[in-house]
Swiss-Prot record:
This is Superoxide dismutase [Fe]. The lineage of its organism: Eukaryota, Sar, Alveolata, Apicomplexa, Aconoidasida. PROSITE patterns: SOD_MN. The gene is SODB. Its EC number is 1.15.1.1. Homodimer. SUPFAM superfamilies: Fe,Mn superoxide dismutase (SOD), C-terminal domain (SSF54719), Fe,Mn superoxide dismutase (SOD), N-terminal domain (SSF46609). Pfam families: Sod_Fe_C, Sod_Fe_N. It comes from Plasmodium falciparum (isolate 3D7). It is an enzyme of class 1 (oxidoreductase). Its main location: cytoplasm.
Amino acid sequence: MVITLPKLKYALNALSPHISEETLNFHYNKHHAGYVNKLNTLIKDTPFAEKSLLDIVKESSGAIFNNAAQIWNHTFYWDSMGPDCGGEPHGEIKEKIQEDFGSFNNFKEQFSNILCGHFGSGWGWLALNNNNKLVILQTHDAGNPIKDNTGIPILTCDIWEHAYYIDYRNDRASYVKAWWNLVNWNFANENLKKAMQK
Protein backbone atom coordinates (compact mmCIF):
# COMPACT_ATOMS: atom_id res chain seq x y z
CA MET A 1 0.00 0.00 0.00
CA VAL A 2 1.52 3.30 -1.08
CA ILE A 3 1.00 6.15 1.38
CA THR A 4 -0.22 9.25 -0.44
CA LEU A 5 -0.28 12.94 0.46
CA PRO A 6 -3.86 13.78 1.52
CA LYS A 7 -5.43 16.59 -0.49
CA LEU A 8 -5.86 19.89 1.31
CA LYS A 9 -9.52 20.83 1.75
CA TYR A 10 -8.86 24.50 0.99
CA ALA A 11 -6.64 26.61 -1.25
CA LEU A 12 -3.08 27.46 -0.24
CA ASN A 13 -4.06 31.11 0.25
CA ALA A 14 -7.27 30.34 2.17
CA LEU A 15 -5.80 30.81 5.66
CA SER A 16 -4.28 34.21 4.90
CA PRO A 17 -3.58 36.61 6.58
CA HIS A 18 -3.18 34.36 9.65
CA ILE A 19 -1.05 31.78 7.82
CA SER A 20 0.36 32.96 4.51
CA GLU A 21 0.22 31.16 1.18
CA GLU A 22 4.02 30.94 1.27
CA THR A 23 4.00 29.19 4.63
CA LEU A 24 1.24 26.79 3.63
CA ASN A 25 2.96 26.00 0.34
CA PHE A 26 6.26 25.15 2.05
CA HIS A 27 4.59 23.38 4.95
CA TYR A 28 2.28 21.21 2.84
CA ASN A 29 4.17 20.72 -0.43
CA LYS A 30 7.66 20.42 1.08
CA HIS A 31 7.46 19.25 4.70
CA HIS A 32 4.28 17.15 4.63
CA ALA A 33 5.05 15.74 1.17
CA GLY A 34 8.61 15.05 2.29
CA TYR A 35 7.40 12.85 5.15
CA VAL A 36 5.22 10.91 2.68
CA ASN A 37 8.09 10.31 0.28
CA LYS A 38 10.47 9.33 3.07
CA LEU A 39 7.98 6.92 4.65
CA ASN A 40 7.31 5.14 1.35
CA THR A 41 11.06 4.65 0.94
CA LEU A 42 11.45 3.35 4.49
CA ILE A 43 8.58 0.84 4.40
CA LYS A 44 9.29 -0.60 0.96
CA ASP A 45 9.74 -4.39 1.20
CA THR A 46 8.84 -4.43 4.91
CA PRO A 47 5.67 -5.70 6.64
CA PHE A 48 4.62 -2.05 7.07
CA ALA A 49 4.21 -1.74 3.29
CA GLU A 50 0.84 -3.54 3.60
CA LYS A 51 -0.45 -1.57 6.58
CA SER A 52 -2.58 1.55 6.87
CA LEU A 53 -0.99 4.81 8.00
CA LEU A 54 -2.75 4.61 11.37
CA ASP A 55 -1.51 1.08 11.98
CA ILE A 56 2.02 2.13 11.08
CA VAL A 57 1.79 4.97 13.61
CA LYS A 58 0.59 2.58 16.32
CA GLU A 59 3.04 -0.25 15.62
CA SER A 60 6.29 1.35 14.45
CA SER A 61 9.25 3.08 16.07
CA GLY A 62 12.29 5.09 15.04
CA ALA A 63 12.39 6.74 11.62
CA ILE A 64 9.33 4.88 10.34
CA PHE A 65 7.25 6.12 13.27
CA ASN A 66 8.59 9.67 13.01
CA ASN A 67 7.61 10.01 9.36
CA ALA A 68 4.29 8.16 9.67
CA ALA A 69 3.23 10.17 12.71
CA GLN A 70 4.21 13.44 11.08
CA ILE A 71 2.01 12.56 8.09
CA TRP A 72 -0.92 11.74 10.38
CA ASN A 73 -0.35 14.76 12.64
CA HIS A 74 -0.15 17.18 9.73
CA THR A 75 -3.34 15.87 8.11
CA PHE A 76 -5.11 16.30 11.45
CA TYR A 77 -3.63 19.80 11.78
CA TRP A 78 -4.90 20.90 8.34
CA ASP A 79 -8.37 19.62 9.25
CA SER A 80 -8.21 21.41 12.62
CA MET A 81 -8.19 24.71 10.71
CA GLY A 82 -10.14 26.30 7.93
CA PRO A 83 -11.16 29.53 6.26
CA ASP A 84 -14.21 31.20 7.77
CA CYS A 85 -13.56 29.37 11.03
CA GLY A 86 -12.27 30.51 14.41
CA GLY A 87 -14.24 32.45 16.97
CA GLU A 88 -15.93 30.75 19.89
CA PRO A 89 -16.89 27.08 19.82
CA HIS A 90 -20.46 25.94 19.29
CA GLY A 91 -22.47 22.78 19.80
CA GLU A 92 -21.29 19.87 21.95
CA ILE A 93 -17.65 20.96 22.01
CA LYS A 94 -18.68 24.29 23.55
CA GLU A 95 -20.62 22.53 26.30
CA LYS A 96 -17.82 20.01 26.94
CA ILE A 97 -15.17 22.75 27.14
CA GLN A 98 -17.32 24.64 29.65
CA GLU A 99 -17.85 21.45 31.66
CA ASP A 100 -14.18 20.43 31.78
CA PHE A 101 -12.40 23.81 31.81
CA GLY A 102 -14.99 26.12 33.38
CA SER A 103 -15.17 28.42 30.37
CA PHE A 104 -13.88 28.81 26.85
CA ASN A 105 -11.60 31.63 27.99
CA ASN A 106 -10.03 29.37 30.63
CA PHE A 107 -9.43 26.68 28.02
CA LYS A 108 -8.05 29.16 25.49
CA GLU A 109 -5.62 30.60 28.04
CA GLN A 110 -4.44 27.16 29.21
CA PHE A 111 -4.03 25.83 25.68
CA SER A 112 -2.18 28.96 24.53
CA ASN A 113 0.17 28.72 27.51
CA ILE A 114 0.98 25.09 26.69
CA LEU A 115 1.61 25.94 23.03
CA CYS A 116 3.81 28.93 23.81
CA GLY A 117 5.66 27.25 26.68
CA HIS A 118 6.53 23.99 24.94
CA PHE A 119 10.30 23.65 24.60
CA GLY A 120 11.43 22.75 21.11
CA SER A 121 9.38 21.13 18.35
CA GLY A 122 6.12 19.35 18.95
CA TRP A 123 2.35 19.49 19.01
CA GLY A 124 -0.40 20.76 21.27
CA TRP A 125 -3.57 18.66 21.46
CA LEU A 126 -7.09 18.89 22.76
CA ALA A 127 -8.04 15.27 23.45
CA LEU A 128 -10.69 13.21 25.20
CA ASN A 129 -9.08 10.97 27.81
CA ASN A 130 -10.15 7.55 29.08
CA ASN A 131 -12.38 9.20 31.70
CA ASN A 132 -14.31 11.08 28.98
CA LYS A 133 -12.72 14.37 30.02
CA LEU A 134 -11.21 16.90 27.67
CA VAL A 135 -7.52 17.38 28.41
CA ILE A 136 -4.71 19.46 26.95
CA LEU A 137 -1.69 17.42 25.94
CA GLN A 138 1.68 18.29 24.48
CA THR A 139 3.90 15.90 22.57
CA HIS A 140 7.50 16.25 21.48
CA ASP A 141 8.67 15.96 17.89
CA ALA A 142 6.36 13.51 16.05
CA GLY A 143 4.55 12.23 19.15
CA ASN A 144 0.77 12.06 19.33
CA PRO A 145 -1.92 10.85 21.77
CA ILE A 146 -2.72 7.80 19.63
CA LYS A 147 0.77 6.37 19.99
CA ASP A 148 0.98 7.40 23.64
CA ASN A 149 -2.56 6.11 24.35
CA THR A 150 -3.28 9.29 26.32
CA GLY A 151 -6.49 10.32 24.58
CA ILE A 152 -8.49 10.61 21.38
CA PRO A 153 -7.44 13.72 19.44
CA ILE A 154 -10.06 16.44 18.99
CA LEU A 155 -7.88 19.33 17.70
CA THR A 156 -4.18 19.99 17.24
CA CYS A 157 -1.80 22.88 16.71
CA ASP A 158 1.63 22.38 15.14
CA ILE A 159 4.38 24.10 17.13
CA TRP A 160 7.33 23.08 14.99
CA GLU A 161 9.14 26.22 13.84
CA HIS A 162 8.42 25.43 10.18
CA ALA A 163 4.72 26.02 10.95
CA TYR A 164 5.24 29.70 11.66
CA TYR A 165 8.80 30.90 11.01
CA ILE A 166 8.18 32.46 7.58
CA ASP A 167 5.29 34.54 8.91
CA TYR A 168 6.22 35.15 12.54
CA ARG A 169 9.96 34.38 12.80
CA ASN A 170 10.62 33.34 16.42
CA ASP A 171 7.38 34.89 17.73
CA ARG A 172 5.43 31.72 18.47
CA ALA A 173 2.95 33.63 20.64
CA SER A 174 1.74 35.69 17.66
CA TYR A 175 1.32 32.51 15.61
CA VAL A 176 -0.72 30.92 18.40
CA LYS A 177 -2.88 34.03 18.66
CA ALA A 178 -3.47 33.91 14.90
CA TRP A 179 -4.23 30.16 15.00
CA TRP A 180 -7.34 30.79 17.10
CA ASN A 181 -8.84 32.64 14.13
CA LEU A 182 -8.66 29.42 12.11
CA VAL A 183 -9.87 26.74 14.53
CA ASN A 184 -12.39 24.44 12.85
CA TRP A 185 -15.01 23.83 15.54
CA ASN A 186 -17.10 21.70 13.17
CA PHE A 187 -14.16 19.29 12.93
CA ALA A 188 -13.82 19.36 16.73
CA ASN A 189 -17.52 18.54 17.11
CA GLU A 190 -17.24 15.61 14.69
CA ASN A 191 -14.25 14.21 16.57
CA LEU A 192 -15.88 14.68 19.97
CA LYS A 193 -19.03 12.90 18.83
CA LYS A 194 -17.04 9.90 17.56
CA ALA A 195 -14.83 9.86 20.66
CA MET A 196 -17.80 9.88 23.05
CA GLN A 197 -19.27 6.85 21.27
CA LYS A 198 -16.14 4.71 21.80
